[in-house]
Amino acid sequence: MDEDEFELQPQEPNSCFDGIGTDATHMDGDQIVVEVQETVFVSDVVDSDITVHNFVPDDPDSVVIQDVIENVVIEDVQCSDILEEADVSENVIIPEQMLSSDVTEEVSLAHCTVPDDVLASDITSASMSMPEHVLTSESVHVSDVGHVEHIVHGSVVEAEIVTDPLTADVVSEEVLVADCASEAVIDANGIPVDQQDDDKGNCEDYLMISLDDDGKMEHDCSSGMTMDAESEIDPCKVDGTCPEVIKVYIFKADPGEDDLGGTVDIVESEPENDHGVELLDQNNSIRMPREKMVYMTVNDSQQEDEDLNVAEIADEVYMEVIVGEEDAAVAAAAATTVHEQEMDDSEIKTFMPIAWAAAYGNNSDGIENRSGTASALLHIDESAGLGRLTKHKPKKRRRPDSRQYQTAIIIGPDGHPLTVYPCMICGKKFKSRGFLKRHMKNHPEHLTKKKYRCTDCDYTTNKKISLHNHLESHKLTSKSEKAIECDDCGKHFSHAGALFTHKMVHKEKGASKMHKCKFCEYETAEQGLLNRHLLAVHSKNFPHICVECGKGFRHPSELKKHMRIHTGEKPYQCQYCEYRSADSSNLKTHVKTKHSKEMSFKCDICLLTFSDTKEVQQHALIHQESKTHQCVHCDHKSSNSSDLKRHIISVHTKDYPHKCDMCDKGFHRPSELKKHVAAHKGKKMHQCRHCDFKIADPFVLSRHILSVHTKDLPFRCKRCKKGFRQQNELKKHMKTHSGRKVYQCEYCEYSTTDASGFKRHVISIHTKDYPHRCEYCKKGFRRPSEKNQHITRHHKEVGLP
């Protein structure tokens, strides 16, 4: 016989108590004291042969109780004078795992103290009465009881059980009575719970399970539990059908709930309950999940952190039952936790409430998971009719698609199942998929949302170059795959938008429109040449016009330098060689590039080179004397306050007042915007398939389609619930709720809440001061960056440091 199992068989009413040790069992007057160690396994007499771990006793009429740990057979203590009716007048303390042997006569005990782990096998008395204040530990095993009257703190529970000796399994006394053909009603009210933490408040746990004649669960509206089942044949042994695995999660509920629990039917045809999972037994036969579900009431004073996106169902949830198996990751973590707890189970002994003992037995494994909620894996065998609840580890099964949203069935107080969507990261549950998606933004490290999306298909990526390569793949589509042909040139395209853009090229080629100047008789075929003519000739900003080419300039020095191109004059000569130049900046560039070895001393600030150290030191004094204004945000120094303000605006602010009309991108300065607009020219135009909008950047086209041709407003304000298409629009809207001061420009309609951005706007737009001068041509600029861009563009040989 296996050490982890024991078999109880009926015999004649002749019993022996075999204690551990010679002095463990004794009789003192009216008291009988029996002391047995924990984990006692029982064997019984079958005809004349008795086998207990290959041990045959001399007396075949005795019952041997053997300690498995020490493998010792203890002497027998036989009780002959036993009364038919037992009346207990004193307080009786029944410890864990009590199992009694056969009792054939009446026993009258004035005071009885029974230690842990006493096996109660056959009690044939007609009635047993116990007074109040009875403390019962986790698992008390009773079998073959004719009539039991159980009083627990004033709550009387009666159970009538048909006598069937030694056929009961090991179950919990408070919830399940083994191998019963009659009805057992148990009231769990008033059961004291051993609180380990004083600050957690009272916690009441109820487990409601009922079985009908066929071994199915039935709901009983009373506060007790009804069981009516027969256990004649174990179907698991006959046809090989094994029970399914049910995963139980216990949630929080208000302490004032009247409904202690029950069961609810789940019909497979209902669409909201379509969450069943086919279960495989040991013979790989498919077994459909049960049609009824158990729910439980758990009161807990602790409350989780408030989440605005969580569905308000925390006070309505009793127990969640997921029919099926865990995924591999969760099962592995659970197995590790159970193994670690089993290692320490021999050292830790705790008193558990009776209601918990029915679900978890003697072990506290799996009572709490990582999120703080109670959970367990229960193995329920309906076919035996005993309602046994034992630990069971499910098989690992690969999920078909990891991206599918897992759902759970929640049984509410009204008895109807609710479908919720749990977060796979923190365990919170939501009533809709939309709330779950919004909640997932709180876990940015787990988001897999791609940044760029193709406008022609569902392709997404986080890299811009990958999207460009993908767009090129659309161009290489075979002509046979629904290619559209151009009527003018016969060129094929993959979609109508590309064909429409291509036809615009034919229209531009066929047009011979001449652009005329409205101030003079100048005309040209290109609009860009006309714009250049207007700026050079008819603009007040370029009053100095070249008589040779008509180009205009702002300053006379610029016109003078330009005239040297037509005359060929080169007044600037190199002192190290015969090189001559029409511009001084070109000469400096020549000296730096060709004669850098002769001038090896360089300034650390402006990178100018000098022939000796004295020149470098004298030059450094210019930088030290000029910079007296220190930036409070960094080490930058400026020669005047206006330069310092420009530095703060351009470096330490995030406002971008200058917007591009094509892509709505913002810039600090107009020069940056002008450079950006020039980048749009000369690129291939992408036509919107819904309107006449076209743009060179495909990402701008995607943004246009989302903002103009879609009704979805994904970005919503948390205060007023107003929706916006883009995130920057939501940020602008949120400033209206902040109550901050709004700065309004007196020259235009510009307004902002940023003081530095407002100053930058006034300086860059409504100021004509040009404090930054070019060292080579003395041209003035508003900002140092504009001056550097000018040097790069017009003084190429000099370059920037």
From Swiss-Prot:
Q: Which GO terms describe its cellular component?
A: chromosome; nucleus
Main localization of the protein? Answer: nucleus
Which GO molecular function annotations are given, in alphabetical order?
chromatin insulator sequence binding; zinc ion binding
Where does the record place it?
Nucleus
- UniProt zinc finger (C2H2-type) residues: 421-443, 452-474, 484-506, 515-538, 544-566, 572-595, 601-623, 629-652, 658-680, 686-709, 715-737, 743-766, 772-795
Keywords of the record: Activator, DNA-binding, Metal-binding, Nucleus, Phosphoprotein, Repeat, Transcription, Transcription regulation, Zinc, Zinc-finger
Phosphoserine is found on S269
Statement: the UniProt record of this protein carries the keyword Plastid: no
PROSITE patterns per UniProt: ZINC_FINGER_C2H2_1 (PS00028), ZINC_FINGER_C2H2_2 (PS50157)
Gene3D superfamilies named in the record: Classic Zinc Finger
Q: Which GO terms describe its biological process?
A: regulation of transcription by RNA polymerase II
Q: Does the keyword Membrane apply?
A: no
Its biological purpose? Probable transcriptional activator. Binds to the consensus sequence 5'-AGGCCY-3'.
Comment field on protein domains: The binding of ZFY to DNA is mediated by the interaction of the GGCC core base pairs with zinc fingers 12 and 13.
Per the record, the similarity remark reads:
Belongs to the krueppel C2H2-type zinc-finger protein family. ZFX/ZFY subfamily.
Q: What is this protein called?
A: Zinc finger Y-chromosomal protein
Native organism: Bos taurus (Bovine)
